[in-house]
Amino acid sequence: MRSQPTRREILAASVVSAPFVGCSGTSQREESGPDTGDLDAAAAKPVLDVSALDTPLIIDSIRLLEKDGDQFVHVRSKDGAEGVSLTNGRRYLGPILQDLVIPFFVGKDARKLESELLFELYRHRSNYKLQGLALWSVQAWVEFALLDMMGRACGKSIGDLLGGTIRDEIDFYVASGRRDSTPEEEVEYLQALVDETGAKAVKFRLGGRMSRNLDASPGRSESLIPLARKALGDAIDLHGDANSSYDPEHALPIGRLLEEVGAVYFEEPCPFDHLEDTKAVADSLALPVSGGEQEYSERRFRWMIANRGVDIVQPDLHYYGGMLRSARVANMAELAQMPTTVHISGGFGFVYMLHFASRTKDIGRYQEYKRNIERYADWFDPPLWIRDGKLGVPTGPGVGIRDIAAVIGGARELI
């Protein structure tokens, strides 16, 4: 017998006077979240504070560079201000950056990034036809560089530009990312990650990834979940990510196992665009269900939040188009008392996660860290740090890189 009530049972118990109940057996109150008009109003709240920039910051150049395996977007204003971002490594998107994005931004005032430019970029030369990873990743690269430039110009960190920092250190989990391991090999690897990073939480992969209910190997997921709890102990929090592996019928037994071990959440149990299937799983579990890594539509995020299709929203800071778009999702989620725990991509992506987490009110219990801090730590002053399961938020202006010239010196220009 299940020891935990489902989410619907919890919601039903909180209803003092029962409203109309339809043939589904669930109340209208149980099915609905905030009004969509209220969610739209929350999303539209301005985030970017450019009040300290009292003169135009006209974008003069945007370049794509490569050095030591990293790709950079470097921006410069007509008065010599500069900023830099690191991409998530998708060089094949270069033509979109070169032909459709850079020409739009050059000559524009960077201060209008939120109020005007991002919306107009979407319309420019029918860019909306490319929405999804192809457009939003490229938009994010430029946005991150412009935020860095604006932060440097006024002496504010990205978190302070985006409404103000409210925390200076972030709890993280470390993710395995493997499916080629046996359960025994996987828990051994997870323990090594904990030993290496000091993480207080881990995430492992379940199912076969977009696999129509097949496991990576027969019985792997069912064995891995209890073994992870036994091997890692109660002091380590667990997360499970199915990467769209299951339909609801097959997701629920996996979710029950995660409930039994007290997991933090069950990520993307069903195909990412099967919103109703994901909601069916979420409605049947007490365990929080998360999703949104592959989402690119604000209106579908709004549906998830309004209909409680997930319990935790997870926009990817690259795939979803940057921090400003992701902050709109966080604003809607906050109205619904729902955490926003961003997904990250790219080796440097954890730095953008730190800035976003530093300013988001309900960021959830843990953020993802994909390791590799030592590659970038000394770019910052003080250096990036990791200890006791926490990452420090960079404190310098913009993204916090101390010396752009030193970081990109000798880079090869791709665009």
Which stretches of residues belong to each language-model region?
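Conserved, mostly hydrophobic/aromatic
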Residues: 80, 142, 155, 202, ...
